[in-house]
A protein has these predicted regions:
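N-terminal regulatory/effector-sensing and dimerization cores
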Residues: 24-122
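Aromatic/histidine-rich interaction motifs
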Residues: 115-144
Length: 211
């Protein structure tokens, strides 16, 4: 087994040992959810947020914004736009449940962190056509952070203290890993919301300087 496969196996064991409820469940870590299904019942959702998800076991089909995606264990899906979606956990059963985890992303945090990237990287990625929804293969570092969030399910009292740092690191890894080429164009400086966030960031950095 590869390192990634070993990590996925560990994450499955950790998640099942926490015995998450059936369906989509919130956790003490803000924005972090568990997904456990034992049937193929299709579900619709419109979360109004951008998010990243990883499948630990099973296969999932997703229809988002008129586009169809299919991805399985060891793959992730990043949705950079708040769009209605319909998904189905394929072949899920009590014996072989579908398991995945997801994290709602904070656009302001992404924009703030993107400002620390080399300008050359930002310009190169900005030339790519925006793609708000895409499947990708996670890095070991990214899976490690998600495993840390899963382990917090056993110590929920520590989630308010530890989860924010882990979640911020996940945002950083998404901007620096294989997702960067598609994620960064969605954060272009021309976006109105980005302008506001950048203005706030400038004020924070320069509040003590004379006008």
């Amino acid at each position: 087994m590869t390192t990634i496969q070993n990590m996925l196996a560990d994450m499955r064991r950790e998640l099942m040992s926490a015995n998450p409820p059936l369906g989509v469940s919130t956790t003490p870590a803000e924005g972090f959810r568990t997904h456990r299904f034992e049937s193929e019942v299709p579900l619709s959702c419109s979360t109004g947020e951008i998010a990243v998800s990883f499948i630990l076991s099973g296969v999932k089909t997703v229809t988002v914004g008129g586009r169809f995606f299919s991805y399985g264990a060891g793959e992730g899906l990043l949705c950079g736009a708040a769009l209605p979606s319909t998904f189905r956990a394929m072949h899920a059963s009590p014996e072989e449940p579908f398991l995945s985890v997801s994290l709602a992303l904070d656009r302001a945090t992404l924009i703030e962190l993107a400002e620390h990237l080399p300008q050359t990287d930002q310009k190169e990625n900005a030339e790519l056509p925006p793609e708000a929804i895409f499947v990708f293969e996670p890095t070991e570092d990214l899976l490690f952070d998600f495993e840390r969030l899963i382990k917090l399910l056993k110590t929920p009292e520590l989630a308010p203290l530890r989860a924010p740092c882990i979640i911020r690191d996940i945002h950083s890894l998404l901007l620096a890993g294989p997702t960067a080429a598609r994620l960064l164009p969605l954060l272009r400086e021309s976006a109105p919301a980005n302008t506001v966030v950048r203005a706030i960031g400038w004020l924070r950095r320069n509040f003590d300087k004379p006008i």
